[in-house]
């Protein structure tokens, strides 16, 4: 078998194609999750916290800020000032938790469906009453 035909067989197997589709959908879903966190959840948290709260501008200055530079994350980062950007980390952490929860729920649903199918298969393998009766008669006759 040539290397090219082996690669085709590998690439066209169901698991590899499923993985490729999953990665593409995951990339698109990442944008949805980011928007959910930044455009919906964080503004609600800011409102509850009592006003306009920009998580991106939550940081600790680790160096001296040059004169004339605004004390915002973007301006300080552009000026090369070292920052501990814990606000951005909070946003990314919330993104991760939401994504992990959604994936958990999807896997949980798939496992439930898989278990249901396994139970149905086991039920199908149970012999009917007629078969059980015939086995019993056969055993009594063989004695």
From Swiss-Prot:
Coiled coil: none annotated. It is a multi-pass membrane protein. The keyword Nucleotide-binding does not apply. InterPro entries: Mechanosensitive_channel_CS, MS_channel, MSC/AndL, MscL_channel. It holds the Pfam family MscL. Keywords: Cell inner membrane, Cell membrane, Ion channel, Ion transport, Membrane, Transmembrane, Transmembrane helix, Transport. The chain crosses the membrane at residues 16-36, 40-60, 87-107. Its main location: membrane. One of its GO terms (cellular component) is plasma membrane. It is found in: Cell inner membrane. GO terms for molecular function: mechanosensitive monoatomic ion channel activity. Channel that opens in response to stretch forces in the membrane lipid bilayer. May participate in the regulation of osmotic pressure changes within the cell. NCBIfam families: mscL (TIGR00220), PRK13952.1 (NF010557). Belongs to the MscL family. Homopentamer. This is Large-conductance mechanosensitive channel.
């Amino acid at each position: 078998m040539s290397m090219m035909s082996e690669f085709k067989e590998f690439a066209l197997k169901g698991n590899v194609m499923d993985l490729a589709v999953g990665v593409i959908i995951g990339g698109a879903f990442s944008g949805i999750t980011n928007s959910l966190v930044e455009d919906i959840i964080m503004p609600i948290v800011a409102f509850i916290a009592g006003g306009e709260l920009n998580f991106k501008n939550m940081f600790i200055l680790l160096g001296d800020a040059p004169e004339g530079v605004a004390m915002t994350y973007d301006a300080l980062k552009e000026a090369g000032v070292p920052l501990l950007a814990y606000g951005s980390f909070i946003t990314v952490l919330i993104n991760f938790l939401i994504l992990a929860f959604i994936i958990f729920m999807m896997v949980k649903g798939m496992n439930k469906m898989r278990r249901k199918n396994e139970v149905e298969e086991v039920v199908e393998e149970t012999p009917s009453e007629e078969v059980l009766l015939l086995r019993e008669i056969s055993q009594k006759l063989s004695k």
